[in-house]
């Protein structure tokens, strides 16, 4: 019996020797300390749910929350070796609900605020999308006697008539537009006292040009603009789109009138159908007006009234109008036709257009009012 007691005492001493290494030794606890600073690595890391799967966030959460917990646990294990595990577990479990309010109080990323509703624009006209959809171009050529006057100055210095120059520039316009987009279609209308549809819509420039040069001028007493629009209405059907501002149209219709008469203000009483056509966002009415404004007899300013009448037809502000003097160089007529090559849905307002690379304001104004 005496021999067994020392054995038991030795066993107890042996167990006491093992305890500091496994349970109550602070140094051993520090060795077993996890990267989060907690004493028991088997417990789930409390900061992880707060920061998600981001690895850097674990270190940030441990540096802010875990050290006070680990210091308390170490002090408890040093004073009460047997109850160290229970105290540590209690401290860690108690720290879990304590950290939840800290997680809730963390600043959240600012949520994007919903933009305030912008009131609709006060513009009176609607703009279609700026797309390069096919065009149906109706070229209306005036055949009044003013077109046959030998007044325009060609490049070589000789005098030529406006009809000859207009025929050449129309051919260049049609062929250039065809190279830009082969889906464009062209038609030809001649204007005497009445308007006559001469060539139907075609995408072949040669077909239109074959009808362009066999034309002669006539003495015209009047000009009925409404009759011209009625002829156009019989040959076209404008697209009907539900959402004008977002859905591109299958095509647009553009009328290009080359006109040279000085009969004062135009007599024009449009019907409801003509008004609807002029107000359509898919119809454009461009005008190249030839006049005698720079002749020696400058007292006659009736051409200005005619030009003002054409300007009043544009209720949308999207049409282009040019006035060219018959006493000037013929190249000005070509320049105006070149400016009309731009797609009507993609070009700017005429008052905003600039055709010069120079910064001189005077030059820009001259270029915009050719």
UniProtKB/Swiss-Prot annotation:
Keyword Cytoplasm: yes
Keywords noted in UniProt: Cell cycle, Cell division, Chromatin regulator, Cytoplasm, DNA damage, DNA repair, Mitosis, Nucleus, Ubl conjugation pathway
Cellular component, GO, one term: nuclear body
Location of region: Disordered: 1-69, 90-126
Gene Ontology biological process terms in this record: cell division; DNA repair-dependent chromatin remodeling; double-strand break repair; mitotic G2 DNA damage checkpoint signaling; positive regulation of DNA repair; response to ionizing radiation
Basic and acidic residues bias: start-end ranges: 11-20
Region (VWFA-like): 137-340
Disulfide bridges in this chain: none
Keyword Cytoplasm assigned: yes
Bias-annotated ranges (Low complexity): 35-45
InterPro entries hit by this protein: BABAM1, vWFA_dom_sf
Localization: Cytoplasm; Nucleus
Comment, domains: The VWFA-like region is similar to the VWFA domain. Its presence reveals similarities between the structure of the 19S proteasome and the BRCA1-A complexes.
Record-linked PANTHER family: BRISC AND BRCA1-A COMPLEX MEMBER 1
Function: Component of the BRCA1-A complex, a complex that specifically recognizes 'Lys-63'-linked ubiquitinated histones H2A and H2AX at DNA lesion sites. The BRCA1-A complex also possesses deubiquitinase activity that specifically removes 'Lys-63'-linked ubiquitin on histones H2A and H2AX. In the BRCA1-A complex, it is required for the complex integrity and its localization at DNA double-strand breaks (DSBs). Component of the BRISC complex, a multiprotein complex that specifically cleaves 'Lys-63'-linked ubiquitin in various substrates.
Subunit structure: Component of the ARISC complex, at least composed of uimc1/rap80, abraxas1, brcc3/brcc36, babam2 and babam1/nba1. Component of the BRCA1-A complex, at least composed of bard1, uimc1/rap80, abraxas1, brcc3/brcc36, babam2 and babam1/nba1. In the BRCA1-A complex, interacts directly with abraxas1 and babam2. Component of the BRISC complex, at least composed of abraxas2, brcc3/brcc36, babam2 and babam1/nba1.
Family, as annotated: Belongs to the BABAM1 family.
UniProt protein name: BRISC and BRCA1-A complex member 1
Organism of this sequence: Danio rerio (Zebrafish)
Gene that produces this protein: babam1
């Amino acid at each position: 019996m005496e021999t067994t007691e020392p054995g038991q005492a030795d066993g107890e001493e042996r167990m006491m020797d093992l305890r500091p290494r496994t349970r109550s030794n602070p140094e051993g606890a520090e060795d077993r300390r996890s990267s989060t600073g907690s004493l028991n690595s088997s417990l789930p890391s409390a900061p992880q749910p707060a920061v998600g799967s981001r690895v850097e966030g674990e270190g940030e959460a441990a540096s802010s929350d875990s050290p006070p917990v680990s210091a308390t646990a170490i002090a408890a294990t040093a004073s009460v070796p047997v109850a160290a595990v229970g105290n540590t577990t209690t401290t860690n479990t108690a720290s879990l609900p304590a950290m939840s309010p800290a997680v809730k109080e963390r600043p959240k990323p600012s949520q994007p605020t919903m933009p305030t509703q912008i009131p609709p624009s006060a513009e009176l006209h609607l703009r279609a999308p700026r797309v390069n959809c096919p065009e149906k171009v109706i070229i209306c050529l005036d055949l009044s006697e003013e077109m046959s006057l030998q007044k325009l100055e060609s490049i070589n210095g000789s005098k030529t008539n406006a009809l000859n120059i207009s025929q050449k520039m129309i051919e260049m316009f049609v062929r250039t537009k065809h190279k830009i987009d082969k889906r464009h279609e062209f038609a030809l209308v001649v204007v005497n006292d009445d308007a006559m549809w001469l060539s139907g819509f075609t995408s072949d420039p040669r077909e239109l040009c074959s009808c362009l040069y066999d034309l002669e001028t006539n003495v015209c007493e009047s000009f009925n603009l409404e009759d011209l629009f009625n002829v156009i209405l019989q040959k076209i059907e404008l697209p009907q789109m539900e959402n004008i501002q977002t859905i591109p149209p299958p095509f647009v219709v553009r009328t290009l009138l080359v006109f040279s008469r000085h009969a004062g203000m135009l007599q024009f009483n449009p019907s409801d159908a003509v008004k609807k056509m002029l107000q359509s966002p898919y119809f454009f009415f461009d005008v190249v007006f030839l006049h005698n404004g720079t002749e020696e007899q400058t007292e006659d300013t009736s051409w200005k009234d005619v030009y003002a009448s054409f300007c009043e037809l544009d209720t949308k502000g999207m049409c282009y109008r040019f006035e060219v003097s018959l006493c000037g160089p013929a190249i000005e007529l070509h320049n105006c036709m070149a400016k009309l090559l731009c797609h009507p849905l993609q070009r700017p307002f005429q008052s905003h257009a600039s055709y010069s690379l120079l910064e001189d304001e005077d030059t820009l104004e001259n270029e915009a009012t050719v």
